[in-house]
Amino acid sequence: MRTLLFSSQHYDQESFTQAARGSALELHFQPARLTLDTAALAQGFEVVCAFINDELDAPVLQRLAAGGTRLIALRSAGYNHVDLAAAARLGLAVVRVPAYSPHAVAEHAVALILALNRRLHRAYNRTREGDFTLHGLTGFDLHGKTVGVVGTGQIGAAFARIMAGFGCQLLAFDPYPNPELLALGARYLALPELLREARIISLHCPLTEHTRHLITAQSLAQMQQIGRAHV
């Protein structure tokens, strides 16, 4: 099965080549981003493997389908950049990455919170210049602070577990409450209440029509001033 990977980097070539060894896949790597202009490069490829910055709107999908493509394989969990209705009309199947380490994303979110709270980037730059003063670098203890988790799927739950380990109080917002968070003592609130009460807010939700512009200027104004500064 001839497969073309758009927006491919050297690490894509290494990992995909190794994973496809011994299979019936014939992999081809294209560093260019998929657009209406580059879609012609997929002529004769049954499978197009795309990344998050590739264009997969109706005109691009139509050109891919005309060139013989039958499957769009996403190298991402998110699919908000794909016109699914157009894909269905054209008979194009679309698959995505069903899961990846929720711990990696959750841990990265916590690392960013710690870095912002303790001004690590500013402190690093200062010490490189021989300035070891603490002015403007002190943050606050996470212990005892209220953390709002917006989206409590696998990643949000992993994030909540870490913050509970810091001794934080948990608030949550999700249409489907997660029993694991309830067991951690989290309180599910309406989003406006969460925004007002939480000192730190972390978003762990996909981009859909329901979540688009979930955070607006109006919702930012509802947050605590310190929370808006650090998250």
What is each model feature region?
Residues 135-224:
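Rossmann-like dinucleotide/phosphate-binding beta-alpha-beta segment
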Residues 90-92, 98-146, 158-161, 165:
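Phosphate-binding beta-alpha-beta segment of Rossmann-like dinucleotide-binding domains, i.e.
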Residues 13, 57, 61, 106, ...:
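A general structural signal for well-ordered alpha-helical segments in protein cores
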Residues 2-93, 216:
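An N-terminal-biased, well-structured beta-alpha scaffold segment characteristic
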Residues 78-81, 101-104, 178:
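Short gly/pro/ser/thr-enriched loop/turn and capping motifs at secondary-structure boundaries
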Residues 229-231:
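Conserved small/polar residues in nucleotide/adenosyl-binding loops
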Residues 25-31, 48-51, 126, 177-184, ...:
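Short, flexible loop segments at the rims of nucleotide/cofactor-binding pockets, characterized by
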